[in-house]
Amino acid sequence: MDNLTKVREYLKSYSRLDQAVGEIDEIEAQRDEKSNYELFQEDGVEEHTKPSYFQAADDSDTESEPEIEDNQGLYVPDPEAEQVEGFIQGPLDDYADEEVDVVFTSDWKQPELKSDEHGKTLRLTLPEGLSGEQKSQWLSTIKAVVQSAKYWNLAECTFEASREGVIMEERQMTPDVYKVTPVMNTHPSQSEAVSDVWSLSKTSMTFQPKKASLQPLTISLDELFSSRGEFISVGGNGRMSHKEAILLGLRYKKLYNQARVKYSL
């Protein structure tokens, strides 16, 4: 440690220090650079042969041949060229990069039904990523479903998904059958003869109670519908039987479940 300090002090007082440093730099610039392999040889390290990867590099420097390309522009290696040890030629990528559109959509929002002093409000969120035409088609579909409620009861429809879309079918309600004493208040022959069931709108139909304490239920189409147009708007048609039209009216007025419990419909 003392010797190093003495050297530093001596160099500070050495008047020709800059000249000596310049001479050293000049000598260093003129010195031949040697590879690590040559330095090992000078130090006496025994090296019999160069590794194969050095030999392959030397060959590539001395003999550079152009790459052979086939008609498709794919690189074909020269079979006579010496292969580097440990390297395995794998298949080259022979496909072109393709641009793939990636769309990140937001989370789907369920329909929201809210009620306030002004009534009920149903909010449907538009699906993400629709074009202008697809948006118009989606809105038209929702509008068509809403308007179809004029002609049938959507709550009574079956819902089935298919490859083409959705299939909704009217569910036929089968009335309960009970052993009761029939009351002949209508003439079957007359019902079958009419071409439009609405012609029997003023004709009453009677349903017997399930309990003796109740009075029979007597009702007509006029009591259930204000007009033939209203009857048609909820799914009625002239080919219905008188009883089917009455049951449709009970469902429309939301009286069917109450009547089914108390009377033999």
UniProtKB/Swiss-Prot annotation:
InterPro entries: P-protein-C_vesiculovirus, Phosphoprotein_C_viral, Phosphoprotein_central. Residues 1-60 are annotated as: Interaction with N(0). The modification Phosphoserine is found at residues 60, 64, 226-227, 233. The keyword Phosphoprotein applies. The record marks 138, 141 as: Involved in oligomerization. The modification Phosphothreonine is found at residue 62. Residues 49-105 are annotated as: Interaction with the L polymerase. Pfam families: Phosphoprotein (PF00922). Residues 245-265 are annotated as: Interaction with the Nucleoprotein-RNA and template-binding. Residues 42-72 are annotated as: Disordered. GO terms for molecular function: RNA-directed RNA polymerase activity. Phosphorylated in the N-terminus by host CK2. Phosphorylation of the phosphoprotein is required for the transcriptional function of the P-L complex. GO terms for cellular component: host cell cytoplasm; virion component. Residues 58-70 have a biased composition (Acidic residues). Residues 109-170 are annotated as: Oligomerization. The modification Phosphotyrosine is found at residue 14. It is found in: Virion; Host cytoplasm. Homodimer. Interacts with the L polymerase; the association of P and L forms the polymerase complex and positions P optimally for encapsidation of newly synthesized genomes with the nucleoprotein. Interacts (via N-terminus) with N(0). Interacts (via C-terminus) with N in ribonucleocapsid (via C-terminus); this interaction allows to package the L polymerase in the virion and positions the polymerase on the template, since P acts as a bridge between N and L. The N-terminus is disordered and is involved in binding N(0). The region of interaction with the L polymerase is necessary for transcription. The hinge region is highly variable. The central domain is involved in oligomerization. The C-terminus is basic and essential for binding the N-RNA template. Nonenzymatic cofactor regulating the function and conformation of the RNA polymerase and part of the transcription and replication complex. Binds the viral ribonucleocapsid and positions the L polymerase on the template. Acts as a chaperone for newly synthesized free N protein, so-called N(0). Plays a role in virion assembly. Belongs to the vesiculovirus protein P family. This is Phosphoprotein. It comes from Vesicular stomatitis Indiana virus (strain 98COE North America) (VSIV). The gene is P.
